[in-house]
């Protein structure tokens, strides 16, 4: 089994379609999908994000990081939320992604999350992280 992150991508035009949607309806729709993932035993994490205009961007392009309010540049590719699933293959992750609700016109990016065992085990910082994960029940 491997972990995959399903990244929900959108843009201003797509987000505008959902501005007037009933919030309770949205919660029910997303909650139903989340229930399916939980019943299948594949859901490890899921979070939606606040509007990009309420966030900040830290730009490391110069000598000193620059903090800018709101979305960075064009909002042609907003990151609206994510799922982390533990499934047998990227193909299975793709099948789950195809079922994500409320994605009309949007995109889902799927990326594998490497496990800690895939990193050099003799590295001091990997050892510290492994100990932290064991201590916090995240391993």
Describe each PLM feature range.
Residues 1-139:
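Conserved, structured core segments of small domains
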């Amino acid at each position: 089994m491997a972990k995959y992150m399903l990244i929900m991508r959108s843009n201003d035009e797509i987000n505008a379609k959902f501005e007037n949607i009933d919030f309770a309806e949205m919660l029910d729709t997303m909650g139903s999908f989340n229930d399916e993932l939980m019943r299948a035993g594949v859901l490890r994490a899921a979070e939606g994000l606040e509007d990009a205009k309420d966030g900040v961007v830290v730009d490391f392009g110069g000598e000193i990081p620059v903090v800018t309010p709101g979305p960075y540049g064009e909002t042609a590719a907003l990151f609206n939320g994510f799922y982390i699933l533990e499934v047998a293959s990227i193909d299975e992750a793709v099948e789950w992604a195809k079922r994500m609700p409320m994605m009309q016109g949007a995109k889902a990016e799927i990326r594998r999350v490497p496990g800690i065992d895939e990193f050099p085990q003799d590295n001091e910082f990997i050892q510290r992280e492994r100990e932290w994960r064991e201590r916090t029940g995240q391993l």
